[in-house]
Structures are given as C-alpha cells and as structure tokens.
Amino acid sequence: MPAGSNEPDGVLSYQRPDEEAVVDQGGTSTILNIHYEKEELEGHRTLYVGVRMPLGRQSHRHHRTHGQKHRRRGGRGKGASQGEEGLEALAHDTPSQRVQFILGTEEDEEHVPHELFTELDEICMKEGEDAEWKETARWLKFEEDVEDGGERWSKPYVATLSLHSLFELRSCLINGSVLLDMRASSIEEISDLILDQQELLRDLSDSVRVKVREALLKKHHHQNERRRNNLIPIVRSFAEVGKKQSDPHSMDRDGQTVSPQSATNLEVKNGVNCEHSPVDLSKVDLHFMKKIPTGAEASNVLVGEVDTLDRPIVAFVRLSPAVLLSGLTEVPIPTRFLFILLGPVGKGQQYHEIGRSMATIMTDEIFHDVAYKAKERDDLLAGIDEFLDQVTVLPPGEWDPSIRIEPPKNVPSQEKRKMPGVPNGNVCHIEPEPHGGHSGPELERTGRLFGGLVLDVKRKAPWYWSDYRDALSLQCLASFLFLYCACMSPVITFGGLLGEATEGRISAIESLFGASMTGIAYSLFAGQPLTILGSTGPVLVFEKILFKFCKDYALSYLSLRALIGLWTAFLCIVLVATDASSLVCYITRFTEEAFASLICIIFIYEAIEKLIHLAETYPIHMHSQLDHLSLYYCRCVLPENPNNHTLQYWKDHNILAAEVNWANLTVSECQEMHGEFMGSACGHHGPYTPDVLFWSCILFFATFIVSSTLKTFKTSRYFPTRVRSMVSDFAVFLTIFTMVVLDFLIGVPSPKLQVPNVFKPTRDDRGWFINPIGPNPWWTVIAAIIPALLCTILIFMDQQITAVIINRKEHKLKKGCGYHLDLLMVAVMLGVCSIMGLPWFVAATVLSITHVNSLKLESECSAPGEQPKFLGIREQRVTGLMIFVLMGCSVFMTAVLKFIPMPVLYGVFLYMGVSSLQGIQFFDRLKLFGMPAKHQPDFIYLRHVPLRKVHLFTLVQLTCLVLLWVIKASPAAIVFPMMVLALVFVRKVMDLCFSKRELSWLDDLMPESKKKKLDDAKKKEEEEAEKMLDIGGDKFPLESRKLLSSPGKSSSFRCDPSEINISDEMPKTTVWKALSINSGNTKEKSPFN
C-alpha cells in the first residue's frame, strides 16, 4: 500500500445536533485503524481507532458546526502498540479471510444490506458553458448504457472492466475521503461535509470550493426525462401498451395518492429541489420502478470534469440512515452510497471507466455486503481485493471489449466465496449431498398406529385456509379452464371403453359421476391437492378380466367388483396405519423417470392412434377419377341377408321391409332401420364425407403447435410482461377456444365430444347402490381378497409414484406433503365408488404434472436482463376442486360441450405428453447417444461421471422402459404395477455396477440399513478428527456456523506456495507502482497520469 502521506495523524468528527459521521483518513493517516484482538474476535466486534468509544464512563459529546475542524490529540501508548501487533498479524491475512471476518460481524438496524440500484451520472463543467449531470448508465443487476443517440437504453449486458481502471479505483479509495455513516438530509449538507474533509487533505481556495460545490449541486437530467411533447401518441409501439406513463395523479408504492406538484414544490435552488419537496412523479419511469425490489436503496456514482481543478477530488460516502435526495436518482428511492470523482478537464473517459468500475463492484454480492458493514477504509479495500481475487481475465488479443456479453440464464451462487479455507477463488471439490431425493419427516416411520397419518394432518392443518386464499389469481383460473377440458375427454373416453367391456354396466355417465365425486373429496381433504385423479390403463384391463370371469362362471359382476373394491380399500387403510408409505424413499429418480416417461409416451401414442382411427369412420376417397365424379352415388338399400337382430327390430316396430322406399331414406333413417349403403361413394359406415380426416389432422396439429407457441410466449420479446404472462397462462384454453370457433366457421362435420345429457345409470337394471354380496355365493367374500391384493399393489404404486414426482424438491413446495393422507382419501373413495358401482380413480401422472407446471410461480420483480427466478408452485385446492365440480355439472352443459371437436382434445393430449417430457433427465441422456462429445451440453453429471457409465445407466433405464411398454400393451397388463415395483430392485442391483459417487450424480441414493449408517457416521467423525489435528491455527465459530482461521501470527506460514495474498502481491506490479508514484507527487500532478 502506498505510503508517504504528510497529513496529520488525527480523526475529524463532523457533528450536527445528534448526528455524527465516521471519517476515515485512510492514506492520510500514519496508522492503520484496525486491531484484531482475541476478545474482539470472539465477540465479532472490532474496535477502530477514530471512533469515539466509552471507556469505563460515558464521555461527553461536543457538538460542532460543519466548518469547524477538530483534530484528536493524544499519545500512542499501550493501544498503539497493540495496534502494531495487530498490524503484523493483518499483513498475513488474505482478502478473503478479512471479508469473511467482516461479513461475520453482528448486524445492526442501520447496516442491514438492502438491494441496490446504482446510477452513473457525468458532468463536464467548462468556463462559460451551462452544464448539468447526465445519466449515462445504470445497474440493477446488469449494466445498461444510454446509447450514443441519447434516445434509448441499451440491452442489459454483463459489465466488462479493465484491470487498470480497477487499480485506479483502489487508488482512489486509498487517497480519497471515506466518510462512513454520515448523517445528512440533503445534497447541500453532503457537499459541505465532503468539501470540509477535502480541506483537511489539501488546500482548497474559496473559488475552487465554490466551483466544486456548484458542480455537485447542479441539476440531474435522467434518460426518462426526454421531451414528450414532440412524441406523437400514435408512434408508441405496441410494446408500450400496458406500461404506465408518468401521471401526477398516480398512486405511489404504498397506495397513497400523490397530488400534482404545485409551483412552490417545483422551486429549485442551484438545480436541486428543496429539502422537503415531494417526489415529482411526472419524471419517474413507473414501469422501471416495478423492477426495483421493495426496500431497495440507491448508490449514486458521480464523475466528471471541472476546469478549475488541478487534481481530482475523490469521496466515498455512506449515509446513515439512507436519505431520499429528490432529483438525484432516476427513481424515488433513498440514497445510501455516493461515490464522487471530480478531476481536471481532459480525462473524462478515464473517469467514466473508474465510475463504471465503482458501480459494477457495488452490484457484486460480496462487496455489496462489505460496503454496508465496513467500519473503515481498510474494510472497503479488503472488499476490492477480494473482488480482484475472483475476477476472470480475458486476453486482450482474443476478445474485443466493445462486445456486449449477454446476461447468463443462471447466475452462479456466490456462497463459495464466503467459505473459509478456499484460497484465491479455488473451489474445492464439492460432493453431492449423500441423502436420498425424498428424505424428510413425511417419510419417517413413526412406529405408532396411524402415526404418519396424524403427522400429515398436523402438518397440513395450519395451511388449510391458505389453500383457498392462495387461489385468488388469474393463473388458477387459466389452469382450471385448461385442465377441465383436458380431464373431460379421458374420463368420458374411459367410460365409453368400460361400457363396451362391461356391456353397459359401467359407462360414461358413471365415469363422469365417479370422477367428479372422487375428485371433489380428494381436493378438499387430501394432503397434496395438486395431484389430479384419473383413470388408468391397468384398471381397465382388470375390469375386462373380471367381467369375463364373472360371465364365464355366472357371477354378478357389480357385486363381486364391490367386494374386491372394499377389500382393496381396507388393505390400503392397513398400509396407511402401518406407515407403509415410508417405503416411498426407495423410489428414486431411476424409477420415477421410467414410470413418468412411459405414461408420457402412452399419452403421445394414444393421441396419434386416436387420430389415425378416425380414418375408419371418415376414410379418404383415394384414386378418384375426376371425369366420373358425376357418376358417384351412395344409396340406402334393403339388406340382402338381414341378421336376427335386424329381423327382431323390424318385428318389434311392425316394419315390412318390402314396402319401405329405401332409396328415399336419409342417412340417419337408413341407419335406424338397419338398412345398408351401396354405391361407389359409400364408406364403412355410410356415405363418404369429404375433408373430415384432413380437417381433423389440421385441428390436431394446429392445437399442439399453437398451444406450445403460446406457452413459450412468456419469454418472447413482444408486448409487455403482464400481457405475455397472461397469454402464457391461458395458452391451452385460448387454443381450444380458437379451434372451436374456427371449426364452427369452417363447418366441416368433424367428430365432436359426446357428453351424457341425462343423469341416470346407463342400464335400467342397476341403481346407484350395489349389494356387495347380491346373488353371488358367500365364499366370494373371502375369495375377493386374492384379486384385491393385486389391486392394492396397483393403486399403491400408481398413487405413490405420482405423489413422489409431484413432491420433488425441484418444485420447491412449502406446505409439505401428505403421502399417508393421500392414500387414505384414495382408499375411502375407492370403497365408496365400489358400493355405488362407479369406476375407480387414482393419481394420474401426466395430468398431475401438467397441473403443477400450469401453477409455476416466477419472480415478478426481476432486474433488466435477469431471468425470472422460479419461486415454487402456487399450492392451493381450488383448481382441482373446480375442475371436478364443473365436471359433475357437465351433464347440464351438453349444449356447449357438443361444439368441441375431438381432434382438438387429441391435440391437447399430445401437448400434455410432450410438455411433461421436458425436464426428464432420461431423455436428455438419451439424446447424448447421437451427439459428438464436443457438442454435448454441459450437464453437471457429465463433469463427474465417465460418458460410458452415463450411457450404461441410460441403456439399463431404456431396457426397463421397453419392458414396461411391452407388458402394458399386452394382455398381461394387469401385472404392470408388479413390474414397476421390480424397477426398485433393478435399481438396487445397479449399486454393484456403479459407485456411490456416480449414482449420486445420475440418480438419488437409496436408503441404507441403520447399522451401515452408524458405521459410516462413525468413520466420518474419525476422518474429521484426523483432519482437525492436521490443520494448524485456532478455530472459532462464525454466525454462519463455518470455521475461520483467526488472523494471527500463526497464519504467516503458508504450506501451499500457490496460495497468495493479492493485497501483498498487488504493490509489486508495475501498474500499481506507477499509480503509487503519481499519487505521491505534488498537487500539480494528477494520480491518474
């Protein structure tokens, strides 16, 4: 550090009534004002020379005016010798250690770090010219510059600084004034305090002082204050629609009306508003104000040229408390920091780069905290040195500094810079946390009957009412409308298939009623209401097998089914009572992704399959001869060989086939009377209908493409943020509405959604309640246990795997989960549905994932250039509740629902399947097979696991997925849940092929036995004890519960030669020596030559 200052050894105390600023002489003092003593380290409080401290009794405080100068007198006794001893120890501290010590100090109310908005203003005062401060750049997270034309802001970009300007900034802080915790309420007072301090450091003539003060009090012109009178309103782009322009009658942030500014309020003195003038909202960019976090403070960087100066005036000021200085900052927030650099004319670009450096490091997370907690100049220098210790240097011959670097999508965490024992920014090898992906109190076995269920209820009860309050959002309305349409079609389709399999004993109306009743109960009382219940393929296979068995052995299907359902419900309740859901911790990412991928692929496959099957009803008339179009016909004729069903129909309705004029019948009349269609223009089920299949394909793919496009509209560059967010939230609903209107206008008879319009059982020979025994023999009560066991496994696996996927840590759920409570609700409603002869419903994976994705929360207040942060999921019960309430009311809405084309719903299925695949690591790894190594994405697991092991893991997972698909598509689909359970054992076997470290990166670690846990814990404690013995130096705990080597003489020996102290090495550089020489020259020389 450059020495050689001839300034007096003392501390100036600027005082007003009840106000005092801590002034640090820095380079002007011959003593470094810092002591690291044992007692102070233990208490995390440091005694600084220059600050009045009570010693034994309260000292009397003298009050002085700004212009008075006071120098402390006194000898250097014992305290001074202790300071020298501390200095010797300090010389061996790295900047990182000093910063850790500063950040470890206790916080008080006046030094709590806030978010900062930094503004760079520049001025050039020359004789005879009227100058004003002009805003040239601003920082909220990234740098934005006023473009050369002065009409617009640049895109946010990552600031690139020259190392030379950083060295110059450090020199400024060493040789300039540092005033910490200044108490002032106006820019005039701040200017007087700064100039008073400058008079102690150098001789300022009255004319220079007046000129500098005049410069500091000049008016500030901000970019948003451009003339609006010349702007024609129609010229405003659509991107500004929705942005609030400045309005004197606007509401302020607290909701209070700000009245128009009166003439007296607009009086200015020396270009600055009076002390008590209110904020003039006509000069505030309210749209940009929304991006500033609540409670943020301002950091003003003022640099410029003044022709009367022969050497620079530098000052760093921290106000306490922060003060709202009207007209100084672009937005009306209180100012906490000021950095002032005024120098001779001719070096404006140099001052600009120093100002950019100051503003940029103020946005640095670590230096930002240091600036708030600094007690003196050396703390700020330690912060800059630590910043320099972490910077990355770009070779001058390989990079153009004028290129603006786009802000990264994800900003790396700076927590590693707060970790002790990591010298020079070298990050130690970080191992992933060795616990499983679902560890938590929800899955701990209590050992008590229904213990897990009781804990689930206690965990969810405090959040119950908030589950309804949190639903007051347009996002929930969009989610509800989208998922209602998405849930209706599979429920009705499942009911139709079930009706075909059971000869109408359970059909569409029962499916609709069962889904509505089960969904409402689950949404009201389940532990995780984000899960959506639906029908599953294995359940349909089970129903088919059971119906065939009952038909072969002359048993009542509905009665036996009711018994099996009751036994299944009872067994599920037993699983709840025994905390069996704790076994979920064995379901790792390997099993989750295989199961979720299969369900997503099934959604995609079935959507395309249903579209293809439309060709059977609406065939394509291929190889048409255009010259013979006039000869095409399709007529209704008498069946040549009527079957018994047709003859019985004619007999029941007294129809004489020979007397019917078949050729004159309409299509519907011909079908009703069991006639046949004959002719070259006939299809499978009647006359050929042109264009239907192709129009259905258009609707199908258009729905998928438009939904996907509108969903990503949130990240586009068009329209304001609020409009983009709303379009993105309502993407699927808007798509369905658009396609329905388009289909109605085109008029092509596409297949429509068929909803039952009467609320009664499908068959007249059954009611809404089923006798569990009925006509069946008594032994069926006991025999029903066997298929109930299989059903229990089916229900448990489907429900819990979906619950695990929804409750993953990546979703940042805050209200906890309830595996036991979820399973209880499914079991109870399964029993109710069995008694009422309704289908069984369990958690639907794709619908649940889609529900969660539609409720994602992102930060609204994001800095320009910063990607919105994912905050979590809007956890509430209302969307699921309304989906199933409206589903139950669908019977009375057939007049509207009949207009929805089925291809549109198939397109929604395709969209849900594809969108649910996003974020599944298995598909990311699958794509690696077709990529050369140099083009592969920078996935974190590729850094730590060999590529061949990654491919092996993916192949095993792919093989399991193919096996699951084969079983699912075969008649043996009823054992599908057993195969999903087998995946857990396959994953356990993989422990033999992969190391624990590799699996921790590719998958979640499976729980180990209690004995092995104890052995591992004991071994870890022994290793840590040996490590502590090998490391020298005293250790003491910080508030962050980390260990930091106390600064002392013992740290002077460094066993690692690569560990350097940048504060020691910097003075050895030629650049720093040149700066030091210049700063030590006479007053005529500038330190920036």
From Swiss-Prot:
<feature type="glycosylation site" description="N-linked (GlcNAc) asparagine">
    <location>
        <position position="644"/>
    </location>
</feature>
<keyword id="KW-0812">Transmembrane</keyword>
<feature type="compositionally biased region" description="Basic residues">
    <location>
        <begin position="58"/>
        <end position="76"/>
    </location>
</feature>
<dbReference type="GO" id="GO:0098978">
    <property type="term" value="C:glutamatergic synapse"/>
</dbReference>
<dbReference type="GO" id="GO:0097457">
    <property type="term" value="C:hippocampal mossy fiber"/>
</dbReference>
<keyword id="KW-1133">Transmembrane helix</keyword>
<dbReference type="GO" id="GO:0030672">
    <property type="term" value="C:synaptic vesicle membrane"/>
</dbReference>
<dbReference type="GO" id="GO:0022853">
    <property type="term" value="F:active monoatomic ion transmembrane transporter activity"/>
</dbReference>
<feature type="transmembrane region" description="Helical">
    <location>
        <begin position="564"/>
        <end position="584"/>
    </location>
</feature>
<keyword id="KW-0325">Glycoprotein</keyword>
<keyword id="KW-0739">Sodium transport</keyword>
<feature type="transmembrane region" description="Helical">
    <location>
        <begin position="903"/>
        <end position="923"/>
    </location>
</feature>
<feature type="transmembrane region" description="Helical">
    <location>
        <begin position="823"/>
        <end position="843"/>
    </location>
</feature>
<dbReference type="GO" id="GO:0051453">
    <property type="term" value="P:regulation of intracellular pH"/>
</dbReference>
<feature type="topological domain" description="Cytoplasmic">
    <location>
        <begin position="901"/>
        <end position="902"/>
    </location>
</feature>
<keyword id="KW-0406">Ion transport</keyword>
<feature type="topological domain" description="Extracellular">
    <location>
        <begin position="844"/>
        <end position="879"/>
    </location>
</feature>
<dbReference type="GO" id="GO:0016324">
    <property type="term" value="C:apical plasma membrane"/>
</dbReference>
<dbReference type="InterPro" id="IPR003020">
    <property type="entry name" value="HCO3_transpt_euk"/>
</dbReference>
<feature type="topological domain" description="Extracellular">
    <location>
        <begin position="751"/>
        <end position="776"/>
    </location>
</feature>
<keyword id="KW-0039">Anion exchange</keyword>
<dbReference type="InterPro" id="IPR013769">
    <property type="entry name" value="Band3_cytoplasmic_dom"/>
</dbReference>
<keyword id="KW-0813">Transport</keyword>
<keyword id="KW-0472">Membrane</keyword>
<dbReference type="GO" id="GO:0097386">
    <property type="term" value="C:glial cell projection"/>
</dbReference>
<dbReference type="GO" id="GO:0042391">
    <property type="term" value="P:regulation of membrane potential"/>
</dbReference>
<feature type="topological domain" description="Cytoplasmic">
    <location>
        <begin position="982"/>
        <end position="1089"/>
    </location>
</feature>
<feature type="topological domain" description="Cytoplasmic">
    <location>
        <begin position="498"/>
        <end position="505"/>
    </location>
</feature>
<dbReference type="GO" id="GO:0042802">
    <property type="term" value="F:identical protein binding"/>
</dbReference>
<feature type="topological domain" description="Extracellular">
    <location>
        <begin position="615"/>
        <end position="685"/>
    </location>
</feature>
<feature type="region of interest" description="Disordered">
    <location>
        <begin position="55"/>
        <end position="90"/>
    </location>
</feature>
<dbReference type="InterPro" id="IPR016152">
    <property type="entry name" value="PTrfase/Anion_transptr"/>
</dbReference>
<feature type="transmembrane region" description="Helical">
    <location>
        <begin position="477"/>
        <end position="497"/>
    </location>
</feature>
<feature type="topological domain" description="Extracellular">
    <location>
        <begin position="1"/>
        <end position="476"/>
    </location>
</feature>
<dbReference type="GO" id="GO:0098793">
    <property type="term" value="C:presynapse"/>
</dbReference>
<protein>
    <recommendedName>
        <fullName>Electroneutral sodium bicarbonate exchanger 1</fullName>
    </recommendedName>
</protein>
<dbReference type="GO" id="GO:0032809">
    <property type="term" value="C:neuronal cell body membrane"/>
</dbReference>
<comment type="function">
    <text>Mediates electroneutral sodium- and carbonate-dependent chloride-HCO3(-) exchange with a Na(+):HCO3(-) stoichiometry of 2:1. Plays a major role in pH regulation in neurons. Mediates sodium reabsorption in the renal cortical collecting ducts.</text>
</comment>
<feature type="transmembrane region" description="Helical">
    <location>
        <begin position="961"/>
        <end position="981"/>
    </location>
</feature>
<keyword id="KW-0915">Sodium</keyword>
<dbReference type="GO" id="GO:0016323">
    <property type="term" value="C:basolateral plasma membrane"/>
</dbReference>
<dbReference type="GO" id="GO:0050804">
    <property type="term" value="P:modulation of chemical synaptic transmission"/>
</dbReference>
